[in-house]
Regions:
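Short, charged/polar N-terminal "headpieces" of proteins
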Residues: 1-23
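Intrinsically disordered, low-complexity boundary segments flanking structured domains
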Residues: 1-2, 25-27, 70-71
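A generic short-segment signal for beta-strand/edge and adjacent turn/coil regions
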Residues: 5-9, 29, 53
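Generic structural "secondary-structure junction" signal
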Residues: 6, 40-42, 46-47, 51, ...
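A broad, low-specificity signal marking well-ordered, structured residues that form hydrophobic/aromatic
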Residues: 12, 36, 82
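A short, structured beta-strand/loop element
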Residues: 15-51
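Short, charged, low-complexity patches
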Residues: 50-54, 58
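C-terminal structural segments of small proteins and small subunits
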Residues: 58-88
Length: 88
C-alpha cells in the first residue's frame, strides 16, 4: 500500500480499492498498531486512533484535500501516486 505521508508517528497510506468494501475515496492512518480508515470528507469509516492523533489526521486531510483526491484518481487509474507533505 503506497505511503503518502508520515508525521508525528502516524503513517498515511492509500491504495487502489476498485470494488473494495469502502466505496468512497479514503486514506488509511496507522499509529502504534492501531488503524483508522477515514474518508477524504473526514468521516471515520472503520477502526480507531487515539483522539489527539485522529484530530491531526483530519486537519491534515483538510489541508491536503485536493492532493488526496488527485492521488485517489491516479491510483484508481493504476498510475503512480505522489507523496504529500507532512503536517508541520
Amino acid at each position: 500500500m503506497p505511503t503518502l505521508s508520515m508525521f508525528y508517528g502516524i503513517i498515511i497510506r492509500m491504495y487502489n480499492e476498485k470494488g473494495g468494501k469502502h466505496n468512497v475515496p479514503h486514506i488509511h492512518a496507522e499509529y502504534q498498531g492501531e488503524e483508522a480508515v477515514i474518508s477524504l470528507e473526514n468521516v471515520l469509516l472503520e477502526g480507531k486512533l487515539p483522539t489527539s492523533k485522529l484530530r491531526l489526521v483530519t486537519a491534515w486531510i483538510e489541508i491536503h484535500k485536493e492532493e488526496l483526491y488527485a492521488n485517489w484518481t491516479l491510483l484508481s487509474a493504476g498510475e503512480k501516486y505522489f507523496r504529500i507533505d507532512p503536517l508541520k
